[in-house]
Amino acid sequence: MTESRSHSRRVWIKADSDVGDWKTRKRRITTGLEAGVDCVLVDPEDISRVQSLGDVSIAAFTSTADSETDSSAETEGVEEADTVVIGKESESDGTDDFPETLSASADLSAIETHSNNTVVETGAYIRILSEEYEALAETAAADASYTIVIGEDWTIIPLENLIARIGSETTLIAGVTSAEEAQTAFETLEIGADGVLLDTDDPDEIRETVAVRDATERETLELEWATVIDIERAGMADRVCVDTANLMQHNEGMLIGSMSRGLIFVHAETAESPYIASRPFRVNAGAVHAYLRTPDGGTAYLSELQSGDTVQVVNTDGQTREAIVGRVKIEKRPMFRIELEYDDDRVETLLQNAETIKVNTQSGRTAVTDLESGDEIRLFYEETARHFGEAVEESIIEK
């Protein structure tokens, strides 16, 4: 299986035989799937079971002997995994004696052989029991796509050492048992580990760890106050409503604009109205030509959005998160043209002429039908040109 969407930070959940019987493992796996973990680490015999539970990336332990004798990893079931992990019940986790020299390491040999001879990614699993095991992890990282390190005591064997030495060579996964430990792993040395391997049965810890992952990926935008200098009826246009598969809070919405350098904060339809029920999943976003800010920092045309796309939700403090587009509705509606001034620059957009469409002013949530010249509204402004939604160093005139 492949991940439907990639995170810059990853949460793996450990669900091998060390966890307990299949009932215990299954409960941990299903909780992880529901929470949104990125990968499940299991023994080979559980791969098909995990596949039947849901679509998620699967990593599977394999023995050093299997990897050395069968470089294609075609031991029973292992070839179905996305990643084969070497190091369990061997020298890397302290089960076998540590080699006299790293060149004599059976695990390192197996990792190198496997990574050179198969399309399945290779992972190294290492318990950091001493400085020798740190050196083992550093060497394994040269060949392993993922280097999983389990600290016996991160206050004694600092994660900082491993991040500094191997963080850029591999995807570094730190073993944790709680959301608090995951937060520390993601923040260490400001760079942080690329991911965590969570070992817990507590459903709350699993969900909170995924929430920590999501929080570390969110950017916080600096929203400015722009002054309304003109608002006028603009006639009929094709208006776009973005209906997400996620409920939005009262202070959330999206950034919309006719000009990519200046995007207006438009509230989600979370407020009750005398005329229509609230639609907390919807942003009445403007006309088909307008830009909407995306989670990667780019923009997309409203007309191009479709079900399954990911869009950026932002609140009035500039904190962002992601939402999935469930549906896009395009209908002919009367529009306002709203022109703003910020720092001697003028930007504008078209929004529907209806009291249910609201922006954020100094007075709070305000319907576009109540806007007046001189009002100040929330704006995200950046001095950059865009081409196909990507920032470019080029002079582009928008008016």
Swiss-Prot record:
Belongs to the archaeal-type DHQ synthase family. Its EC number is 1.4.1.24. Catalyzes the oxidative deamination and cyclization of 2-amino-3,7-dideoxy-D-threo-hept-6-ulosonic acid (ADH) to yield 3-dehydroquinate (DHQ), which is fed into the canonical shikimic pathway of aromatic amino acid biosynthesis. This is 3-dehydroquinate synthase. GO terms for molecular function: 3-dehydroquinate synthase activity; dehydroquinate synthase activity; NAD binding. GO terms for biological process: amino acid biosynthetic process; aromatic amino acid family biosynthetic process. The keyword Oxidoreductase applies. Pfam families: DHQS. Keywords: Amino-acid biosynthesis, Aromatic amino acid biosynthesis, NAD, Oxidoreductase. It comes from the Archaea. The gene is aroB'. The lineage of its organism: Archaea, Methanobacteriati, Methanobacteriota, Stenosarchaea group, Halobacteria. It catalyses: 2-amino-2,3,7-trideoxy-D-lyxo-hept-6-ulosonate + NAD(+) + H2O = 3-dehydroquinate + NH4(+) + NADH + H(+).
